[in-house]
């Protein structure tokens, strides 16, 4: 099953972690843009990074809907402040398949082209994954297949690796397992603890997620078995 991995609490006031959203807003034809659906359960820092990339023109896409399963998710309020279609679909006390069915219906109604998990702390059912085959992406704070699941940063420190990072991958029916789209490396320093390492990984996540989304939406890559590969260049017509 798919699951968005958890993160330690990071102080987003640090300059290192805040994406630069101060660039000039680029006006583009919204009708031609691919639509994103964002799922989040918490503060949604990767959602903020994606939204900032769109505002600055670095990512050509439109956020069609932001869905949270938690009413107290700061990311949901952030989406409302941005004037986005922010939807609460509570999950507490509900059967997973029933809740997923409602989320899928909302995503379908919004006509999204790609579903992005941004701190969505729910396991996705097999029906959900099948409804958006190779159209759901997740970001995980390790170089998969190393250190899947919870507390990936702590796992990396305890194992003693010298390099870790983050991975953007398609979601399949297994945890942190789908085909890898893009990875970025982060060195593990001698004085690192889980918080300092998490902070540096998160800074790279903010870059990597938008890059990977742009790559997928460009149509230049495809999934072959477990591999995400670039499509062959078309021969020019004579």
Language-model region placement:
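One-carbon transfer enzymes
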Residues: 3-238
């Amino acid at each position: 099953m798919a699951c968005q991995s958890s993160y330690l609490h990071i102080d987003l006031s640090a300059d290192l972690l805040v994406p630069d959203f101060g660039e000039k807003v680029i006006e583009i034809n919204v009708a031609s843009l691919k639509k994103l659906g964002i799922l989040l359960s918490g503060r949604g820092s990767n959602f903020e990074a994606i939204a900032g990339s769109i505002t600055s023109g670095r990512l050509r896409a439109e956020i069609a809907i932001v869905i949270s399963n938690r009413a107290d998710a700061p990311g949901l309020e952030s989406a409302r402040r941005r004037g986005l279609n922010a939807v609460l679909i509570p999950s507490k006390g509900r059967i997973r398949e029933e809740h997923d069915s409602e989320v899928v219906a909302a995503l379908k109604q919004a006509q999204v082209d790609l579903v992005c998990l941004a701190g969505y702390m729910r396991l996705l059912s097999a029906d959900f994954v099948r409804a958006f085959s190779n159209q759901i992406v997740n970001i995980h704070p390790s170089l998969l297949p190393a250190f899947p699941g919870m507390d990936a940063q702590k796992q990396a420190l305890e194992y003693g690796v010298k390099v870790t990072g983050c991975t953007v991958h398609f979601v399949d029916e297994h945890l942190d397992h789908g085909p890898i789209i893009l990875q970025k490396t982060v060195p593990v320093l001698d004085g690192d603890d889980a918080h300092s390492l998490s902070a540096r990984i998160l800074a790279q996540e903010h870059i990597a997620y938008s890059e990977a989304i742009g790559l997928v939406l460009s149509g230049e890559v495809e999934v072959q078995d477990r591999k995400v590969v670039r499509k062959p260049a078309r021969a020019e017509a004579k």
